[in-house]
Each structure stands twice: as C-alpha cells, then as structure tokens.
Amino acid sequence: MERFGRLLRVNLSTGSITQEEISPSWIEMFIGGSALAARLLWERLRPDLDPLSPESPLLFITGPLTGTAGPAVGRFTVCARSPATGLWGESNCGGFWGPELRFAGYDALWIEGRAPEPVYLWIHNGRAEIRPASHLWGQDPYAVQAIVREEVRDPLARVAAIGIAGENQVPFALILCDHGRVAGRTGMGAVMGSKNLKAIAVRGTQPLPIARPETFQALRAQANRALREDNLTRVFRETGTAGAAEYFDLLGSMPKRYYGQGAWEGASKISGAAMAETILSGVSACHACVIACGRVVTIPEGPYARTKAKGPEYETIAAFGPNLLNDDLQAITHLGDLCDRYGLDSISMGNVLGLAYLLFEQGRITERETGGLSLRWGDIRPVEILIAQTARREGFGALLAHGARGLGRAFGAEDLAVEVKGLEVPYHDPRGVAGIALSYATSPRGACHNQSDFFMVELGQSSEELGIPYLDRHQVEGKARYVAIHQNWRTACNSLVLCYFANVAPSVALALLNAAMGMGVGSAHDAASGGAGLAIETGDQQPSGCHAGRRPVAQAAPGAPGRWRSGRLRSGSGDHAAGILRGSGVGSCDRPAHAGNPPAVGAGVCPGGEPVTAIGVPSRRTADGSGSA
C-alpha cells in the first residue's frame, strides 16, 4: 500500500508535537476522510464530553486521493464533537489546503488541549511549530492569510483560519481557507477557537507516490473527459452553484419566507445567470478541478461596492435572498462576504435570521428585544448589524448565536425552528424533493444536504451503478432503501475524499483508489466502508440522545407549485411527517450508550427511535472490521 496514514498530533496545552502512523487495518476498512476520522475519534468522544473543552479533539483529515491529479480531489474534512448539536460534527472543505497538508508530509492533523494564549500552527515539509497569534486575534480570515504568509515568508503557504465568531465560540462558526472555501457546518470554527488556535498554515513540496501511475493517469483522463461533457458540471462551470436557484425555485424546493411561502417572483434577479450578466468578473477552482464552480464578482459602485469578492454560492443566495424575501443580488453578496469575514456559517446564520423575522412578524419578538431593529420581510438593512452582533455575541445577536433551536426555545417557539438535531436545515425543501426528508432525519450530523445529496438523484443525476432507478421527486413509497444506499455511497465519497460535483462513477472512483494505493478492493468493500463510517458517525449521537421537534409542516406552503407534496412520509412500519425538519419523531433516539464498541455496520437510528440495521448495506461486519455482527 502506497503511503497514506501519517498523522501529526499536536497538544496545545503542553506544546508537544508528535508523529504517528494510523493503523493500516483501519485505513483498509475506512479508507480516509470522515469515516476514518469517526474511527479515530470513537474512543475520545465520550457522551459527557464538552465539545469546547481542552480534552475535546479536533481532527483535520484528507483521503488517499487528496492532492493527486485525480478529478476534483482538493477537499478535506474537519471532525469533532459539534458545539451546535452535541453530536457528531463534520465539515467538508475544498480549495488547496488539504492537498498542501499532504504535500507537507501529513494525511491527518489531530489537535487537542488549549493554548494559554492565541497561537497558530506552521506545518512545512515534515516539520511543525506553534507560533504566537495574539496579533492575529480579532482579524478576519482573509487578513490572517496575508499576514501569516508574510510571516512564514512563503506566498504559496495555504492558511485555514477562523474569524471573530470562532474566537467567541459561536456554535456555527466556520473555518475559512484559500479564496473563500469554508468548512462551514457544525461549528468546527468554534472548536478551533476554544483551543485558542487562530490559524493553521501548511506548505509542502513532497510528491505523493502513485502505485500504478499509468493506470491512474488513464483513469484521470477518462474522468475529466466525462466531467467536461456532463451537462450538470457545464452548468456549474458557467453559472456556479447559484445557477440552481431558478431551477430549484421552479421545482418548489428553494424555501421562501422561512419555509412559509411557495411562490416568489425574485428568483430570476438572484440567479447564477443574473450574476453572470451583472457582477461576475471571474471564476475560481479548487485543486485538480476542471469544473471551476467558484465565482469572483466585482461591484463597481453603490453601498456594496468592492473590487473583488467571492460570488455567493446557492446556499448563501437562498439564505439571504428568498428566505428573507430579498432580491438584491449585490446585498446578498455583501452579506455572504460578511459571514465569511466574521467566520459564520451562512446556512445557519440565514436560518436563525429567518426564524427571528418570523417571530417578529408574529409579535413574539419586538423592538425591545432587537435593540430597536424592525425585522420586516424584504428589508435586509438590520441583517448586517445582526451578523456582527452574532459574531461578537452582543445585543440581540447574543440570542441568535444560540442557533435556531436556542432562539426558538428562548421565545417559547421551539416548534417553529427549522432544524434537525440542533443543526439548521439547509435550503432544499423536502416538499419539492421528498427523498431529502429522510436524509435530513437520519444524517449523523443533523440536517445535511451533503450526507446524501439525494435531491440530485431525484432531479435526474445518474446513479445507475448504485442500482438506484429513476425516482419521481414527489414519490415517497419505496424510496427509503435508495436513500440508505446513496448515504452509504456518499459516506464512501467523503472517505476518499471526492467532490460530489464531479459525480465520479463508483467503478471509476474505486479504480482510482486501487491505482493510487495499490489496493484491490471492489464495490462490496466500498459499500461496506461507507456503511461502517456512517454507522460510527451515527453511533456518536446515540449516547447523547436525539429528540424530535414538533413542526411537521405536513401541508404545502401558500403559492407552492401544483405538485408540491403535502402529507406524511411512510418508512417501513412507521408513519413520519414529510415536513421541513424532524417532524413528529423523525430522528429521535433515546437508547443507552453502547458499551465501548462502535455499532455494527449499517446500524443506525430509525426515524421513530427504533434500531435500523443494514438497510441497503451489503455487509454485516462490525465497524472495526473484526467479524460478523
């Protein structure tokens, strides 16, 4: 097996830095990325562990394809106990930082402890050091990148940094690197801030060995040709993820007015096409990617003028656009940039703001609580103030910083908060694409459109090799099995670590892995590794217990497209709400802690709280691969 498995362990309390090798048997079973991270963290994530305590580990991890010349392999994963949910925390990020960590000689970075003063890490070609960062505290991540590169005297150093929100341990704080690529979900920036760790700079020139280079090169060329010819990747290349806005609006899957409205006339003003026609000035790509879905924009004049900024992704557009009934693309760009600079996940920030606007409309929140701010749909003038307050935990922002569940609880409206297991729901409404409802309910980290982007399958993305047939997006019956299969496959993708946008066929992905590592695994192993990783990630939530919400939303919103589904979701013998979020019982779990061992492959939590075993997982091995379950 070619080199993969070098872990750098840093204890910020003691200042110790050591290197170690990850067990080859674990790599064989879990590959890398989030599944391997789940196995590495399993013994350390005790049910009573405070996610923001010095003892809580933070793990940055790559996959065996990261940094190679393979298709769209620039991503890495950050994992820890989530301060947002208290459960499994995982965030996936693109750019160049992950490949650079491997070039520097490491495949994973384990951080524990808490530095007495702010610090940053400098990792370069097999060496690592802890440096003072008090002068960086309070700086935004882009400024930190520039300062750190100057200090390490290397303009090519890649820097991952947190903003003020991470410093203040806001539960949905992000980590930003490169040209605005972010590890946004589950509050990994807060965990980093709790350790007084402002940034991690990496630089390396070490080559990555490929076991069978000629085979790998041929597979790479084949995959990239398919990418260039694929219609979906062509859309991403031409309009970015924002190009999905009008289409999702047409399907009724882009939420408006905090999931309370179906029809809206502003989608065409904030779409990827509108961006291309008005403020687009360039594109950006991650390592080894021919898609280049990133947008670069210029706003020449007006209150949001800037010479160069990251164009907003679909989630940011939906968060600060239709969610608040705002059709000003320049304002959305500005608010998304503010979230990046303050270090806040725009999905969660937009969600909690939407709830605040709704509660203001209902009279549960008044100007007395908001500090004189009037929260009216379509008026986004207060949003800039509230983003800053949230990052600083000041004023009304101190309440918003507790997330949607916390805000709802504070005003006796927890049933109105659109979240799953404490994680705010992203902007893909299950009433327009039914399968994502079950994915939200069963995702280990809470509401997640990346644990399984099943809505893409429902919209026609090829999944023939997985045995998933064409499924009507409104169909509910018989869909659970295919959601489970897709979740396992996406967990395997997160182990490699592959960008979903490439939509690499499973056979090609496995062939690339075998060529890179000199392995000989087949599709059954791939499905098993995905199921095993998902089982451990899900198992992390079981000791803590996950409880259901009370907003099933079993009816379509006013003005929704004609076929927008209402009613209830049936799965197995249970009858569960096909609503916006957890529904009446979806995702609940009150089982006692497991006694020392990870759950079996395929074991999970059913929407009603009963054990789910091996749904769509063709393996019965235990999570550590030791034998039959």
Question: PLM features: what roles do these ranges have?
Answer:
Residues 1-92, 96-618:
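Intrinsically disordered, low-complexity segments enriched in small residues
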